[in-house]
Amino acid sequence: MAKKLEQLQTAVQERLGERLRDCVLDADRGELAIEVAPADLHQAMTTLRDAEGLRFDMLMDLAGVDYAAWGEDEWFTDTAEGTGFSRGVQGNNFARLGITGIYGVQEITENTGRRFAAVYQLLSVELNQRLRVRCFCEDDRFPVLDSVVDVWSGANWFEREAFDLYGIIFDGHPDLRRILTDYGFVGHPFRKDFPLIGNVEVRYDEQKRRVIYQPVSIEPRVLVPRVVREDNRYADRKRREEGASDA
């Protein structure tokens, strides 16, 4: 398996060349993951599909990702803070009002170009090999990527889902519209700055005899307290290391 992955890695590097931003081989998991720039996405995907030794003829999945606050620790335990469960019982806070911010608190103002990404899972049926491709949107405020529907027709609904949930625009998509939420939905619910309780709620009005939108009436309350336990997964190894150092 490791040798086959190394051969695939070499083939990908040779075929994509400078279009390859990153290439990570995880032999333990049997995975190869690459990253390409948005300007090179469509051409790189076409190469991955058509090139000899690659032949990724199937797009198995496409998922949007919001990396806002990725790698930051939200499990503060010494003080009460706005990113924990406490915000669910405080009235008139950012999460309640729907003001943009990480977990409903800090406002997002910096454009990092590393917030929104699309991740593609590719399969070569002919060569029985897999590849993960990631591509970041350059603009956090208006994330755009090229559509790959003309490369793999199965990308159609995948891209619509990523647009619906994350607001990623796929340029060149033949019918880019919502697929999971209704057409009047406000915002993109999988973004990390989307209010936990939403912006509006929908109900059937008996008098008007139709479905109506109204302000959220939910009173959010967390009934299960946050419990932070000590991490004992490596306790035995830690004790052995401490014993060795004492000796």
UniProtKB/Swiss-Prot annotation:
Please tell me whether the keyword Nucleotide-binding is annotated for this protein.
Answer: no
The reactions it catalyses are: a quinone + NADH + 5 H(+)(in) = a quinol + NAD(+) + 4 H(+)(out)
User: What's the domain of life for this entry?
Assistant: Bacteria
**Annotated family:** Belongs to the complex I 30 kDa subunit family.
Quaternary assembly: NDH-1 is composed of 14 different subunits. Subunits NuoB, C, D, E, F, and G constitute the peripheral sector of the complex.
Which NCBIfam families does UniProt cross-reference here? PRK06074.1-1
Question: What PANTHER family does the record tag this protein with?
Answer: NADH DEHYDROGENASE [UBIQUINONE] IRON-SULFUR PROTEIN 3, MITOCHONDRIAL, NADH DEHYDROGENASE UBIQUINONE IRON-SULFUR PROTEIN 3
The name this protein goes by in its record: NADH-quinone oxidoreductase subunit C
> Mind giving the lineage of the organism this protein is from?
Bacteria, Pseudomonadati, Pseudomonadota, Gammaproteobacteria, Chromatiales
